[in-house]
Every structure is written in C-alpha cells, then in structure tokens.
Swiss-Prot record:
Name of the protein: Glutamate--tRNA ligase
GO cellular component, one term: cytosol
PANTHER family given in the database record: GLUTAMATE--TRNA LIGASE, GLUTAMATE--TRNA LIGASE, MITOCHONDRIAL-RELATED
Entries under Gene3D superfamilies matching the protein: 1.10.10.350, Glutamate-tRNA synthetase, class I, anticodon-binding domain 1, Glutamyl-trna Synthetase, Domain 2, Glutamyl-tRNA Synthetase, Domain 3, HUPs
Motif stretch ('HIGH' region): 9-19
UniProt main location, coarse: cytoplasm
Placement of sequence motif 'KMSKS' region: 248-252
Enzyme Commission number: 6.1.1.17
Length: 476
C-alpha cells in the first residue's frame, strides 16, 4: 500500500503550533515510509476563510521545511462532489431532511438539560412520511440533511497511537447534520464530517494523522465511509499540546502562531526539532537534537505518547540556542543582517559583519538577541549602572587614561591581540591595579556595561571602525 497522508488546515487563522505539529508528524511518517505528504486547504467556512491565512499557512510550512508532494487541494472547488455524496445517501435512505427549526431544537436541548440529560438530537424527523414533509415545505421551512446513526451500532478501529478504539452509536449525539439549511429539495453547504470523508477518499489517503480532539469525528466518519462504500484509511490520533497548567494550549496562552515564533527569533530548525518532540519520544541512544530528515529515519507511532504534551519554553529556547551556536558565521549573518538593517544601522564591510556574527553567536538564544547584543557595536552606548560603578573603582580611570596614551603612541597594522594584551598589562601596572580592573573598565567604556562577548575581540571590532578611542575619551 502506498502511504499517502495529508494536512488539512482551515484558513480561518494563521498557522497554529498544534496544526504545525500535526504537519510534522504527517511529514515524518510519510518520509519514513517512502510515501507522500499532501496538503488540502479546507476553506468551506466562507465567512472566516481568508486568502491571507492560506498564504500564512503555506509560508509557515515552507519555512519549517515541510515540503508537500502534489499541488494543494482547495476543498471549496469540490463542493459538487460533496453534494453528490449527500444525494447518494439520500437516495439510499441513509440520510434524510430534517425541518426542525433552530427554536424547536433549542427548546429540545433545554428540556433535556432540565431532565439532567446530555443534549442530543432526538431524531424527531427521521421517519417523516411524504404528507408530513409536504406540510413542512408548505410552511416554507428550510431543511438540513442528517445522516442516520444507529444508536445500537458499535464503531471500532485500531488506532496507531491508542490501540483498539470502540464507540457506540448512542455516544454520537443522534443523527448527524451533514449539510446546512437550504430550501426544500436543495442541499445546503456540506459539512465537515461528510466533506473530509469524500476528499480523503478522492485523494487516496491511506493514513489520517490528527489530534486526539478528532476522535469523536473519526467514529462518525467511519459510519460515512461504510455508507458510501469508500476505502477506510488507518487512523492515528496524536496527543494535544498543553500549557503549563495542563490545559489545551490556546491563544489565551500567548504566542501560538508559527509566524509569531518566527518573528520572535526562533529558527525553523529548532521549531521543527521541538515540535517533533511534542508527544514523540526518540529511540534510546538517539540525541534529542536533530533535523527533520534525521528524525524521519527513526519515526514510528509506537513511540508517540497518549498523554498530552506540555509546552516547555526552556527546552525550545535551549534547542534554539544550540542551533544558533552551531551555525556557520556566514549562515548566522544571513539571518542577522535583515534584523540589523531593520534596526536602521548602516552596516560596515562584509568581513567585519561576519566577525561580529561569529562573536555574538555563542551567546544567542533567539535571533532577536543578535539585535540587542549588536546594538553597542552600531550605536554609542549609554553607560549602565554597572558600567558607571566600575568606572568609579579606584585606579579605573587612571588605567584607561594610560591605555589611551599608549594607543595614541601606538601604530599597528590592523588589530594585534598580543599587543592589545600587553597594553592592558602596562595600563594596570601604571595605575597600580590588577589587570582585571582595567579589562572590566575597558568593557564598560566600550559597551556601556559589564556583560558582553569576548573583550579583546570586541575591542578589535570597534578599533576596526574607529570607535575604540572615541569611547575611551568619553569615559575620562
């Protein structure tokens, strides 16, 4: 059997991390099996679906490296196929028109609640005779189409994550609406559970991999597969992503959109790596840091957890820092340059920028940190409290004054590290303080603070653009 999986996002919002994690699991399984990863845009919600959300979803998947193997299917372009399937069910008496008004249905639900029962459709129009239907039609009533569900039916499947699953027809809330209201003898807009069955069959989907919040939908859809005589795929229901309190991650928890993570400075490699670990355990002896291609070689559903996966910011930050630390300086500069330009900085020559990227790389957690940490290299720094305190230490300014005098008398071809170290030693001796005092004071003068990357390299970079002497003079 050829493995064909699909991601089927609705363009009613930006690419959510839950949808992206589902995409990662689908992609990993397809690549591990030598199969195909497909994309279907479920845009049948006409009011909420927007082209800009489709663009955001596609761009987010591309950014993560989740390439798909065929042209994306646009669900709304296949509505005639969906209506044809509904008509087939009507013709076989496996579905029927329900004329109950919204007011009547709400009254039904309120009565059920008052009786302590779970709200469900009571199948009141399941067996209307022609005269009853004609009477409703003469009133001008519109109708939904409902799919018949036998309360005594048992729905079973072997879930690739959860094992054997069993549902009763009585658990599904009564006969299921499969199309919206429309005038009598017409079929309104087809609804989700019918539509995805028709589309998955048309796309020859072999495995449906999605979140556990779809388990009840799977039970309903299996009945539709059987009623339409369509081949039934295998199902895998992955765990939900949870917040720190153990509840489903939602917009109320803050950042959940992939484009937001991207804007915050997370790399595609770290995001894809982390999402792979949200609910999947790597085989023993396997490093938790990997590329998608590496993960695909060992991915299997027997290591996907049933329990929800808590979102761990610390782990994501660690993974992102490791990616940034290991990036070659040219690749890191490629990521940082647009951010530096956006900050309004005129960039010096390429080699200087490469050396700055290399200097900052080991201290970055997020790409945006590369803006904050680069700022004193492009802008005159403001002395922070710790910098001011350091410059007030006995001998600090005397040492810097001596260093400045030495620099005024020094002629070097480029910045010489050994010579720079000797100048610091000389300044410390002249001021009768430890060399560390001079080094801290120099850092305060150059960067405005005591925290920062390697001092000598920092000094060298600023010297190359003629900023070291200016900053020393400012502090004296």
């Amino acid at each position: 059997m050829k493995v064909r999986v699909r991601l089927a996002p609705s363009p009613t919002g930006t690419l959510h991390i839950g949808t992206a994690r589902t995409a990662v699991f689908n992609w990993l399984f397809a690549r591990h099996q030598g199969g195909q990863f497909l994309l279907r845009i479920e845009d049948t919600d006409k009011e909420r679906s927007k082209p800009e959300f489709t663009t955001n979803i596609l761009e987010g998947l591309k950014w993560l490296g989740l390439n798909w193997d065929e042209q994306p299917i646009i669900q709304s372009q296949h509505v005639d196929d969906h209506r044809a399937a509904i008509q087939k069910l009507l013709d076989r008496d496996l579905a029927y028109r329900c004329y109950a008004s919204e007011t009547e249905l709400e009254a039904m639900r309120e009565t059920q609640k008052a009786q302590g029962k779970a709200p469900r459709y009571d199948n009141r129009h399941r067996d209307l005779n022609p005269e009853q239907e004609a009477a409703f039609q003469s009133e001008g009533r519109t109708a939904v189409v409902r799919f018949r569900i036998d309360d005594d039916a048992t729905i079973s499947w072997k879930d690739l994550v959860r094992g054997p699953m069993h549902w009763k027809g009585s658990d599904l809330g009564g006969d299921m609406v499969i199309s919206r209201r429309a005038p009598a003898k017409e079929i309104g807009d087809p609804l989700y559970n019918l539509v995805v069955v028709v589309d998955d069959a048309a796309m020859s989907i072999s495995h449906v991999i999605r979140g556990e919040d779809h388990i009840a939908n799977t039970a309903k859809q299996l009945l539709i597969y059987e009623a339409l005589g369509l081949p039934i795929p295998q199902f895998a229901h992955t765990p939900l992503i949870l917040n720190s309190e153990g509840r489903k991650l939602s917009k109320r928890d803050g950042v959940t959109s992939i484009s937001d993570f991207q804007a915050m400075g997370y790399t595609a490699e770290a995001m894809a790596n982390y999402m792979s670990l949200l609910g999947w355990s790597v085989p023993e002896g396997t490093d938790e840091r990997f590329t998608l291609q590496q993960a695909a070689t060992v991915f299997s559903f027997d290591r996907v957890n049933k329990a929800g996966a808590k979102f761990d910011w610390d782990k994501l930050n660690w993974l992102n820092s490791q990616v940034l630390h290991d990036l070659p300086k040219d690749q890191l500069l490629h990521e940082l340059k647009p951010l530096w330009s956006k900050a309004g900085w005129a960039l010096p020559e390429e080699n200087w920028c490469l050396d700055l990227a290399e200097l900052l790389g080991p201290s970055l957690t997020l790409l945006k940190d590369g803006v904050d940490q680069a700022r004193p290299f492009f802008e005159e720094p403001t002395l922070q409290a710790d910098g001011l305190e350091q410059l007030a230490v006995d001998g600090a300014k005397a040492g810097l004054s001596n260093l400045l005098d030495q620099l005024d008398r020094t002629s070097w071809d480029g910045f010489d590290v050994k010579q720079a170290q000797q100048l610091l030693t000389n300044a410390a001796q002249a001021a009768n303080v430890k060399k560390g005092v001079i080094m801290k004071s120099l850092r305060a003068a150059l960067l405005g603070r005591l925290q920062g990357p390697d001092l000598i390299t920092t000094w060298g970079l600023l010297a190359r653009i003629g900023q070291d002497l200016n900053r020393l003079r400012r502090c004296l």
